[in-house]
C-alpha cells in the first residue's frame, strides 16, 4: 500500500502517526468516512470557534485543532479563514454541496490541486491578490504553494479550495445567465439583502490583459501604431473571441467575461501606452548616447608626448580599388551604410564597419573645426596627428615618384574646392602606414567660367561612378566637402588660381621615412611656373641639380585665364642635425604660406 502513496501522502501519514493517532483510529476513521453525516449545526455557530466553545470535529480538519509552534500561521495567531463567513450567505443545499467538493479536494494530492488552481487563475486572468483578499492567506505563502507545491496547513488549504469552488460557480453563472451581462457587476442574488452586504468594501478587480489578447494587439501594433475607431472595434471583437475560447466557452457569451471584458476604450489606452513607451525608450537611448558624447574625453595632438605615435590600426582589403578620381560630390550619393554623413564629424562616433575593417571617424583624429585660418603661425602645425587610415584615392604611382625617399609607394590626397571659406578635413594616407591629417582652408571663390572643360567632364563622371561603388568611404568624404568639391587625379592635379589657395599645409610620410623627414632642413628656391591655357598638352618639369627634388609635371588648369606666373617652392635636403624634431615643419618659418605652390604635387614617402 505504501508504494501506491505519493510522497506528500506518505509525509501526511507520517505526520498523523507522529501526532499520536494510532493505526486503529485511522482505519476506523476511514471506515466511518463514507457514512459520515454533517451535524445540524447552524452556520452561525461557526463564529463560536473564536470564543473557544466546543464544536463538532469535522473529518476535513475545519474544526478547532491544536497545532504546534512550527505549524502556526505566518501572523503568529490561529488562522480563521474569512471565506468561511461567506458560506452564511449560501442556501443550505449550496453550502452542503460546496463543503462536499472541498472535502474531496482535501483528500487528493495537494500539489495536484495546487496546479489545478493555478491553471484556473491563468485561464481566467484572475490575480492572486483577489485570492489573498478573499481568503486571508499570505501572498508569499500562496505563491509558493501554487508554484512550488510548498506544504500548506489543512485549514488554509480548505479556505483556498472553498474560494476555488465558489469562484467556479460564480463564473459559470456569469456565462450561463443573461442577466449577468454587464461588465464589472458583482454577483448579487435575489435572496441577498442590503443588510447582508459585507461592511468591508472590496477593491475592484483590476483589468488584466490575457496572453491571447496581447498577442493579437502586438501583431496589430506592428501593422498600425495608431488604429482608427473601426480598427479598434474589430480588435475588440477578436480579443473577446480569443478570451472566450481560452476559457472554453462560446464567443457569443463574451459578456460573461465580467471585468476581463475587452472594450474599445481599453484597446485605445493600450495603443496609447505602447506609443508612449516607444517614445520614452527612444528618448532614453538618445540621452544615453548624448551623455556618452559629453563625458568622453577628447585627445588632441599636443596632448601626446613627443617621440611616440598613437594611431588606429586598419586592415586594408587588398581588393580595394586605388584608382584616383575627380568628381562632384552632388553626383554621387552616400552609401546607406554610412548615412547620415554628419556622423563622421561626431567626436564620439563609433567605429564604422566597412569591407576592409573598422574605419575610425574623421574628427576623432584631429580638431578640424577649431583651426583659425587667419593665424599663420607655427602653432597650427601642432594640430597634425599621425594615424593609420585606408587610402581614399591614389594620386601617384611608383614610377611617377621621385627618389627623395627610400620607400616609395602610392600616396593619397583629398583635394577640394569650396564656394565659401570653410575648414574641411584633408586626409593623406600611405596604405596602412603613418598618415598626417590636418584641416585645409578652401578659400577660392569659383566663378562660372572656372569650370572644367566639357571634354574632360564625361570621362571623369564615369570614372567617379565606378570608383564610388568600390570605395564607399570616399563617397562619404565627398559629402563632407561643399557642393563644389572636386577630387583630382595626380596626372590631372589642378593648377590653382593663387598661391594663397591653401593657407595651411599637409605633410605625409611613411613610417620608415619619419626620421628622414624630421632631419631635413628647408631651403627656399624660386622656380618659374609657366602659365598656359587649359588645352596646353605639353608638360614641363621642374629641374634642379639636387636629386632629391621631385619632378612636378605640368597639369591642367581650372580656368583658361592665366593667373600667376611664378611662385615659391620649398624643398627639403638631408641634414645631419636632427635636433629640432618637435614639429614636422621647421620652426624657422613663421608662416605656412611659403610652403604652398600654385601647383599641387604629392609623393610617396
From Swiss-Prot:
Alphabetical list of CDD domains matching this protein: homeodomain (cd00086)
Keywords: Activator, DNA-binding, Homeobox, Nucleus, Transcription, Transcription regulation
Biased composition (Polar residues): 321-335
InterPro entries documented for this protein: HD (IPR001356), HNF-1 (IPR039066), HNF-1_N (IPR006899), HNF-1_POU (IPR044869), HNF1_dimer_N_dom_sf (IPR023219), HNF1a_C (IPR006898), HNF1b_C (IPR006897), HNF_P1 (IPR044866)
One Pfam family of this chain: HNF-1A_C
Domain named HNF-p1: residues: 1-32
Region annotation (Dimerization) ranges: 1-31
Segments of this protein annotated with the region Not present in other members of the HNF1 family: 448-453
Motif (Nuclear localization signal): 200-208
Protein's GO biological process: insulin secretion; liver development; pancreas development; positive regulation of DNA-templated transcription; regulation of transcription by RNA polymerase II
PROSITE patterns: HNF_P1 (PS51937), HOMEOBOX_1 (PS00027), HOMEOBOX_2 (PS50071), POU_4 (PS51936)
SS bond partners: none
DNA-binding region per UniProt: 202-282
Entry similarity comment: Belongs to the HNF1 homeobox family.
Binding partners and assembly: Binds DNA as dimer. Forms a homodimer or heterodimer with HNF1-alpha-B. Potentially also form a heterodimer with HNF1-beta.
Known role: Transcriptional activator that regulates the tissue specific expression of multiple genes, especially in pancreas and liver. Binds to the hepatocyte specific promoter element HP1. Binds to the inverted palindrome 5'-GTTAATNATTAAC-3'.
Protein name, per record: Hepatocyte nuclear factor 1-alpha-A
Protein source organism: Xenopus laevis (African clawed frog)
Classification lineage: Eukaryota, Metazoa, Chordata, Craniata, Vertebrata
Amino acid at each position: 500500500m505504501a508504494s501506491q502513496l505519493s510522497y506528500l501522502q506518505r509525509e501526511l501519514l507520517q505526520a498523523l502517526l507522529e501526532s499520536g493517532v494510532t493505526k486503529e483510529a485511522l482505519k476506523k476513521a476511514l471506515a466511518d468516512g463514507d457514512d459520515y453525516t454533517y451535524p445540524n449545526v447552524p452556520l452561525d455557530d461557526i463564529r463560536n470557534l473564536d470564543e473557544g466553545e466546543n464544536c463538532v470535529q469535522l473529518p476535513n480538519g475545519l474544526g478547532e485543532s491544536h497545532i504546534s509552534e512550527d505549524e502556526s500561521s505566518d501572523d503568529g495567531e490561529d488562522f480563521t479563514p474569512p471565506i468561511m463567513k461567506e458560506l452564511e450567505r449560501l442556501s443550505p443545499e449550496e453550502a452542503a454541496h460546496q463543503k462536499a467538493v472541498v472535502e474531496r479536494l482535501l483528500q487528493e494530492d495537494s500539489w495536484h490541486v495546487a496546479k489545478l488552481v493555478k491553471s484556473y487563475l491563468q485561464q481566467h486572468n484572475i490575480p492572486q491578490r483577489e485570492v489573498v483578499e478573499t481568503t486571508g492567506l499570505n501572498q508569499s505563502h500562496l505563491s509558493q504553494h501554487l508554484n512550488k507545491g510548498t506544504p500548506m496547513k489543512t485549514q488554509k488549504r480548505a479556505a483556498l479550495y472553498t474560494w476555488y469552488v465558489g469562484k467556479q460557480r460564480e463564473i459559470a453563472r456569469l456565462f450561463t445567465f443573461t442577466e449577468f451581462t454587464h461588465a464589472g457587476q458583482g454577483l448579487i442574488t435575489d435572496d441577498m439583502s442590503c443588510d447582508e452586504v459585507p461592511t468591508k468594501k472590496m477593491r475592484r478587480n483590476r483589468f488584466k490583459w490575457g496572453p491571447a489578447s496581447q498577442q493579437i494587439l502586438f501583431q496589430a501594433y506592428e501593422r498600425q501604431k495608431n488604429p482608427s475607431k473601426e480598427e479598434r472595434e474589430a480588435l475588440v471583437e477578436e480579443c473577446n473571441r480569443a478570451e472566450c475560447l481560452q476559457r472554453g466557452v462560446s464567443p457569443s457569451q463574451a459578456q460573461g467575461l465580467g471585468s476581463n471584458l475587452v472594450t474599445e476604450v481599453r484597446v485605445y489606452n493600450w495603443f496609447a501606452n505602447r506609443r508612449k513607451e516607444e517614445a520614452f525608450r527612444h528618448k532614453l537611448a538618445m540621452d544615453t548616447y548624448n551623455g556618452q558624447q559629453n563625458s568622453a574625453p577628447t585627445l588632441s595632438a599636443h596632448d601626446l608626448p613627443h617621440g611616440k605615435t598613437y594611431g588606429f590600426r586598419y586592415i586594408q582589403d587588398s581588393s580595394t580599388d586605388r584608382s584616383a578620381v575627380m568628381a562632384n560630390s552632388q553626383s554621387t550619393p552616400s552609401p546607406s551604410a554610412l548615412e547620415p554623413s554628419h556622423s563622421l564629424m561626431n567626436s564620439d562616433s563609433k567605429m564604422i564597419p566597412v569591407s576592409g575593417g573598422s574605419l575610425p571617424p574623421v574628427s576623432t583624429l584631429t580638431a578640424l573645426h577649431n583651426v583659425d585660418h587667419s593665424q599663420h603661425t607655427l602653432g597650427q602645425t601642432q594640430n597634425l596627428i599621425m594615424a593609420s587610415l585606408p587610402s581614399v584615392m591614389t594620386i601617384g604611382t611608383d614610377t611617377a615618384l621621385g627618389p627623395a625617399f627610400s620607400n616609395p609607394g602610392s600616396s593619397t590626397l583629398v583635394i577640394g574646392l569650396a564656394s565659401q571659406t570653410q575648414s574641411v578635413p584633408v586626409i593623406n594616407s600611405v596604405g596602412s602606414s603613418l598618415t598626417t591629417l590636418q584641416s585645409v582652408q578652401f578659400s577660392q571663390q569659383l566663378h562660372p567660367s572656372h569650370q572644367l572643360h566639357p571634354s574632360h567632364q564625361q570621362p571623369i563622371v564615369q570614372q567617379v561612378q565606378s570608383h564610388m561603388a568600390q570605395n564607399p568611404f570616399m563617397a562619404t568624404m565627398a559629402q563632407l566637402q561643399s557642393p563644389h568639391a572636386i577630387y583630382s587625379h595626380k596626372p590631372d592635379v589642378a593648377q590653382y588660381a593663387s598661391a594663397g589657395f591653401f593657407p595651411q599645409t599637409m605633410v605625409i610620410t611613411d613610417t620608415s621615412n619619419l626620421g628622414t623627414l624630421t632631419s631635413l632642413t628647408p631651403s627656399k628656391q624660386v622656380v618659374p611656373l609657366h602659365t598656359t591655357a587649359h588645352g596646353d598638352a605639353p608638360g614641363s618639369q621642374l629641374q634642379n641639380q639636387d636629386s632629391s627634388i621631385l619632378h612636378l609635371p605640368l597639369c591642367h588648369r581650372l580656368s583658361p585665364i592665366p593667373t600667376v606666373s611664378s611662385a615659391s617652392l620649398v624643398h627639403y635636403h638631408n641634414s645631419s642635425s636632427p635636433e629640432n624634431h618637435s614639429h614636422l615643419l621647421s620652426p624657422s618659418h613663421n608662416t605656412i604660406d611659403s610652403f604652398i605652390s600654385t601647383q599641387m604635387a604629392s609623393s610617396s614617402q
